[in-house]
A protein has these predicted regions:
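Juxtamembrane transmembrane-helix termini in multi-pass membrane transport proteins
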Residues: 2-78, 138-156, 160
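Alpha-helical transmembrane segments and their lipid-water interface positions
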Residues: 29, 55, 59-67, 88-94, ...
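Alpha-helical transmembrane segments of integral membrane proteins, especially early/N-terminal helices
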Residues: 42-52, 113-128
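Selective transmembrane alpha-helices of multi-pass membrane proteins
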Residues: 73-103, 159-160, 164-169, 182-196
Length: 196
C-alpha cells in the first residue's frame, strides 16, 4: 500500500476521472482523428494518434516543470494562442473543402499519408490547441495541489498521456471497422465539413 501512496497522489481518482471526461468531449483532435480514420483507417491514423498523445505529454511536462515560465511570459502565451487559432483555421478550411468521394473499403489506400506527416499533424493539432495547455495546467495545479511529489506528478502525467494514446487508438480502430466504414462512406465529407 505504501508504494501506491508513493506513486499516486490521493487525488488521482478525481484526476483520472476528470481527464477521461475531457477525452469524451469532442474537440479539434477528435474531429481530425475521425476524419483520418474514416479515410485512411488504422494504418493511416496511427501516427496521428502518436502525435496527439505526444503533444498532450509535452503540455503535461510543461505543467509539471515549467509552467511558471510561460505564465510569466504573456507574449509567448499570446503567440501560442495565435498560432493555435491559425492552425485550427487551416485544419477547418481543409475539412470544409471536403468533397464526396468513394472510400476504398477493400485493401489499403494508395493515398495514405506517410507516418511522419501523420505524426506532425497530430503533434501540431495537440500543441497548437491552447485549451490543452490550460486544461493540463488547471488539472495538474488545482486538482493535485501543492503537496504532491514530483514522482506523483510524473506518474499522473504518464497515466494521462497513455490514456490519450489508448483512447485515440481505440477510437480509430472502431471507426476503421468494415461495418462502420460502410455506414460512414456516404457521409464522410459531411462529417469533415461539420468538423471544419
Amino acid at each position: 500500500m505504501d508504494i501506491l501512496a508513493t506513486l499516486f497522489p490521493s487525488a488521482f481518482p478525481a484526476l483520472a476521472l476528470s481527464h477521461f471526461v475531457a477525452l469524451l468531449s469532442p474537440g479539434p483532435d477528435f474531429f481530425l482523428l475521425v476524419g483520418y480514420a474514416i479515410r485512411y483507417r488504422l494504418r493511416g491514423s496511427v501516427g496521428l494518434c502518436l502525435g496527439i498523445a505526444a503533444g498532450n505529454g509535452l503540455y503535461i511536462l510543461l505543467a509539471i516543470i515549467g509552467w511558471g515560465i510561460l505564465r510569466q511570459a504573456p507574449l509567448l502565451f499570446t503567440v501560442i494562442e495565435l498560432l493555435g487559432a491559425a492552425y485550427l483555421l487551416w485544419i477547418g478550411s481543409l475539412l470544409l473543402r471536403s468533397r464526396p468521394a468513394t472510400l476504398a473499403l477493400h485493401g489499403a489506400s494508395a493515398s495514405r499519408p506517410p507516418l511522419v506527416k501523420q505524426l506532425f499533424l497530430g503533434l501540431g493539432s495537440s500543441l497548437l490547441n491552447p485549451k490543452n495547455a490550460l486544461f493540463y495546467l488547471a488539472l495538474m495545479t488545482s486538482l493535485l495541489g501543492p503537496n504532491v511529489t514530483l514522482v506523483q506528478q510524473a506518474v499522473s502525467g504518464a497515466w494521462m498521456t497513455s490514456v490519450v494514446l489508448i483512447w485515440d487508438l481505440l477510437l480509430v480502430t472502431l471507426i476503421a471497422l468494415p461495418s462502420v466504414q460502410r455506414r460512414l462512406s456516404a457521409v464522410v465529407w459531411r462529417v469533415e465539413r461539420t468538423a471544419g
